[in-house]
Structure formats: C-alpha cells, structure tokens
Amino acid sequence: AEKLEPVLPLIV
C-alpha cells in the first residue's frame, strides 16, 4: 500500500 498496489489506498 505504498503507491505500489493501488488496491487499498492507505497512504495516498
């Protein structure tokens, strides 16, 4: 979730 896998926007 660090701009690698845009599935769960935790740190957007």
From Swiss-Prot:
* Keywords assigned: Cell membrane, Membrane, Methanogenesis, Methyltransferase, Transferase, Translocase, Transmembrane
Q: Where in the cell is it found?
A: Cell membrane
Catalysed reactions listed for this entry: 5-methyl-5,6,7,8-tetrahydromethanopterin + coenzyme M + 2 Na(+)(in) = 5,6,7,8-tetrahydromethanopterin + methyl-coenzyme M + 2 Na(+)(out)
GO aspect biological process, one term = methylation
Q: List the EC numbers from the record.
A: 7.2.1.4
Is Kinase there in the keyword field?
A: no
* UniProt GO MF annotations: tetrahydromethanopterin S-methyltransferase activity
Enzyme class (EC, first level)? translocase
Question: What is the protein's membrane topology class?
Answer: Multi-pass membrane protein
Q: Name a single GO cellular component.
A: plasma membrane
Question: What binding partners and quaternary form does the record give?
Answer: Composed of six different subunits.
What is this protein's function per UniProt?
A: This enzyme complex catalyzes an intermediate step in methanogenesis, the formation of methyl-coenzyme M and tetrahydromethanopterin from coenzyme M and N5-methyl-tetrahydromethanopterin.
Q: What is this protein called?
A: Alternative tetrahydromethanopterin S-methyltransferase 28 kDa subunit
Q: Which organism is it from?
A: Methanosarcina mazei (strain ATCC BAA-159 / DSM 3647 / Goe1 / Go1 / JCM 11833 / OCM 88)
